[in-house]
């Protein structure tokens, strides 16, 4: 078993986990509400903790000579479940209602979004179990990958947005699977599958960056039907919605709207603002 490849693979896994966790804080704030951003932290803790218990239970059935294959399988599962969780998040928008349907959607989001962290945790836990004699080196690569993921997030988020970061994470996780698979003899199938998955995810990132086919269509219970401009930054998603004849609005995370109009004197948007201000002054 090639230990350097295992170490590099773990670095890619932890890099991917931190990028995913932090990008989910932005995605949850845009698709749901800002206080749900902190749910990403609990998801990471829940998934990682569950993976530790799982590996502890099944580790005796995992033959040491097949460690590379199991690590590669965990990395591929991380990549695939990540795409699945993104689909669930985007197709189950929360609303202002408090009925059972809304709670069911939230449960689906929580369960699906925890899966990538579970499989990533399985890879890290299994590597620590099998390479306990070199835990200092493994932990070094673990922390280095996590730190690099945090540093890369802001420039990459500004460049391609939170949704494409989630897709990019799948490519990086699958690339870790390539390293894991090639670290052990007899893991050619796992290596090839991981490589194909990494390339496919990379192509999907490039395609979606130019077409925006995978994007937020409904947020906070409202359809986004007239988006003129959309851009992610390190702390929010900015959209411009409406039409230039009646006026447009700039929104932060599908909320906090600010109206813009060509004709400020006759704008219905500004009239609403003046009416609201007049009502406020009468109350006070």
Located regions from the model:
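Alpha-helical transmembrane segments of multi-pass membrane proteins
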Residues: 1-284
């Amino acid at each position: 078993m090639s230990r350097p490849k295992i170490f590099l693979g773990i670095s890619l896994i932890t890099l991917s986990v931190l990028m995913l966790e932090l990008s989910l804080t932005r995605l949850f704030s845009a698709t749901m509400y800002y206080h749900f951003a902190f749910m990403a932290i609990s998801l990471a803790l829940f998934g990682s903790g569950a993976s530790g218990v799982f590996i502890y239970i099944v580790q005796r059935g995992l033959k040491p000579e097949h460690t590379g294959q199991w690590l590669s399988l965990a990395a591929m599962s991380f990549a695939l479940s990540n795409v699945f969780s993104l689909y669930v998040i985007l197709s189950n928008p929360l609303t202002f209602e408090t009925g059972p349907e809304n709670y069911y959607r939230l449960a689906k989001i929580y369960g699906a979004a925890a899966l990538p962290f579970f499989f990533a945790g399985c890879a890290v836990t299994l590597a620590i179990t099998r390479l306990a004699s070199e835990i200092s080196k493994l932990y070094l690569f673990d922390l280095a990958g996590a730190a690099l993921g945090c540093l890369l997030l802001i420039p990459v988020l500004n460049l391609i947005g939170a949704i494409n970061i989630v897709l990019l994470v799948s490519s990086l996780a699958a690339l870790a699977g390539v390293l894991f698979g090639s670290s052990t003899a007899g893991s050619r199938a796992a290596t090839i599958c991981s490589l194909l998955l990494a390339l496919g995810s990379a192509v999907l990132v490039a395609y979606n960056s130019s077409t925006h086919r995978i994007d937020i269509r409904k947020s906070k219970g409202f359809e986004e039907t007239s988006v003129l401009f959309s851009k992610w930054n390190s702390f929010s998603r900015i959209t411009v919605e409406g039409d230039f004849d009646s006026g447009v609005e700039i929104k932060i995370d599908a909320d906090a709207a600010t109206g813009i109009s060509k004709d400020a004197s006759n704008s219905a948007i500004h009239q609403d603002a003046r009416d609201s201000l007049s009502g406020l002054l009468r109350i006070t």
